[in-house]
Amino acid sequence: LEQKHIPVITAPAKVKRDETFLVTIEVGKYKAHPNEPGHFIEWIELYSGDTFLFRVSFAGSLSDPKVTIPIKLTHAHGPLKACEKCNLHGLWEGIKDIEVED
C-alpha cells in the first residue's frame, strides 16, 4: 500500500536562496497507483517545513498524480514535505531534506 501512495519528491539537495528550481512530486513512482473513477488521488500539496507552498487538484481518472512546479525559497523552513490524498486510503506524506545556501 505504501509503494502506491507515498508521494516521492525529486528536487536538488541544495539550492540558492531566492533562485528558482524545479520540484517534482509523483504518487505511484515505485508501484502504479490506480487511476480510475472509484480510486484516485484527489490532490498533492507541498510544504517547506510547516510553510504551505502549493496545492494541485486532480480530476479523478482524467489526470496522472504527478506534478512539476518551479519554486524558490528565501531560507530553509525545514525539509520539503509533500502530502497527498487518496479518495479511498486517506492522507500520505513524503519528505526530502533540502539545504538553502546564500
Please state what every model-predicted region is.
Residues 72-77:
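Surface-exposed, short loops/turns at beta-strand junctions within beta-sandwich domains
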Residues 85-95:
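Short acidic/polar inter-strand loop motif in beta-rich domains
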Residues 15-28:
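Contiguous beta-strand segments within globular domains
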Residues 38-52:
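Extended low-complexity, serine/threonine- and proline-enriched intrinsically disordered segments
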Residues 1-16:
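Short, compositionally biased P/S/T/A/G/V-rich stretches that sit at domain boundaries
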Residues 65-69:
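Short strand-edge motifs at loop-to-beta-strand transitions and within beta-strands
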Residues 51-61:
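Solvent-exposed serine/threonine-rich low-complexity stretches and specific carbohydrate-binding patches
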Residues 26-36:
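Short amphipathic, basic-aromatic surface patches that mediate peripheral association
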